[in-house]
Swiss-Prot record:
One GO MF term: quinolinate synthetase A activity
Protein's UniProt name: Quinolinate synthase
Name of the gene encoding the protein in the UniProt record: nadA
Top-level enzyme category: transferase
Catalytic activity, EC: 2.5.1.72
Lineage, highest ranks first: Bacteria, Bacillati, Actinomycetota, Actinomycetes, Propionibacteriales
GO biological process: 'de novo' NAD biosynthetic process from L-aspartate
Catalytic activity of the protein: iminosuccinate + dihydroxyacetone phosphate = quinolinate + phosphate + 2 H2O + H(+)
Length: 394
């Protein structure tokens, strides 16, 4: 099935926390924005000049991404913002945790703006600080907290990053998760000893990394459910585990079904299955290649003309890759699936409103992380940046 033929179902009703497969996706594409807004956005950007720097995540819609000064994954964009100290305003076309990370990494004279404050992340919201602190207390009660290092995926709130910083842990991306877990185990004597990891908030990235990259078994991993007493685990299970996975997932990547892979291989000769590690372990086992958004982009760029690919990641990115590489047969790894509904809250009307407000001298939707949280979250990020040898890209 080509991108053009795909029945599009972009707007979810919200995350089903009891399901591994994310959200329901009724509805149609959002209506196209008024073409006049394009000229207004251009005029506002021109009026602001170098005072504004617009960041666009790979999953943003085309009407927004055209105005980005830089596109990339969440951590690349935060670092790009930090590398532009002369820009007074950082307009982040992404979601809330990304804007928080940009605020943490930029200077005090810079202001980070999120065009729509409702652009959150369901995965990041699955790990709340109070829940994580309760889990930490339960680990202490089980007698294992002193052996645990918390590791959080970049896709988490500043509060969770700070929790990891305070408790000897760090942040990771999908590219450096393996080396981050290796570092974490080493802090408590190594994987062969009593060391354990609490991995937040994406269980699938944690499981895929622990099992497929580090050689642990699926049975070495247990899942902590914050909605069940004791996480749904016994003290004995906690003591036996090597990796304690938080019960979180990406609502988009969680929808891809392993069954689709078999159908695609039967209908598209020679198709290569390329997926993001936020997908379920069962799907990843059936894929040919697994990697971050940057890895996916580079893989398609380097692929030979005429090759066939089915990609399991957010649809906006897959559509752009298909348009950019017409010499390759690129399809989407499902018959119907959501766009990231929260990412798509950043639309052209919100971007124009944010930019025109700046032209008028008003800062709207500023994202500010409080100083204490920023200090500890920055420590967790700096530990990641000090890791040897691996990319720090999503």
């Amino acid at each position: 099935m080509t991108i053009a033929d795909l029945p599009l179902l972009p707007l979810g009703r919200g995350t089903d926390l009891t399901s591994e497969r994310g959200v329901e996706c009724p509805g149609d594409l959002p209506p196209a924005s008024d073409p006049a807004l394009v000229e207004r956005a251009r005029a506002a950007k021109a009026a602001l000049g170098d005072r504004v720097f617009v960041l666009g995540h790979h999953y943003q819609r085309d009407e927004v991404i055209q105005f980005a000064d830089v596109t990339g994954d969440s951590f690349k964009l935060a670092r790009e913002a930090a590398a532009r100290p002369d820009a007074e305003y950082i307009v982040f076309c992404g979601v809330h945790f990304m804007a928080e990370s940009a605020d943490i990494l930029t200077g005090p004279s810079q202001q980070v703006i999120l065009p729509d404050l409702a652009a959150g992340c369901s995965m990041a919201d699955m790990a709340r600080l109070t829940q994580v602190e309760m889990a930490w207390d339960a680990l202490a009660a089980a007698g294992v907290a002193d052996s645990v290092v918390p590791v959080t995926y970049m896709n988490s709130s500043a509060d969770i990053k700070a929790f990891c910083g305070r408790n000897g842990g760090l942040v990771c991306t999908s590219s450096n998760a393996e080396v981050a877990l290796e570092w974490a185990f080493e802090q408590k004597g190594g994987v062969e000893g009593d060391a354990k990891i609490l991995f937040l908030p994406d269980q699938h990235l944690g499981r895929n990394t622990a099992v497929l990259k580090m050689g642990l078994s699926v049975d070495d991993c247990v899942v902590w459910d914050p909605f069940r007493p004791g996480g749904g685990l016994t003290p004995e299970q906690l003591r036996a585990a090597k990796v304690i996975l938080w019960r979180g997932h990406c609502s988009v990547h969680g929808k891809f079904s392993p069954d689709v892979v078999d159908e695609l291989r039967a209908t598209i000769p020679g198709v290569q299955i390329l997926v993001h590690p936020e997908c379920t372990h069962e799907l990843v086992l059936k894929a040919d290649l697994v990697g971050s958004t940057e890895f996916i982009i580079k893989t398609i760029e380097a692929a030979p003309s005429g090759s066939s690919w089915s990609i399991g990641t957010e649809l906006n990115l897959v559509k752009r890759l298909s348009a950019a590489h017409p010499d390759k047969n690129i399809s989407f790894l499902d018959k119907t699936v959501c766009y990231c509904s929260t990412m798509n809250r950043i639309d052209l009307p919100h971007l124009v409103w944010a930019l025109e407000s700046l032209v008028a001298g008003t800062v709207v939707n500023r994202i500010e992380v409080d100083p204490e949280t920023e200090t500890w979250a920055l420590l967790a990020l700096e530990r990641m940046l000090a890791l040897p040898g691996k990319s720090h890209k999503d």
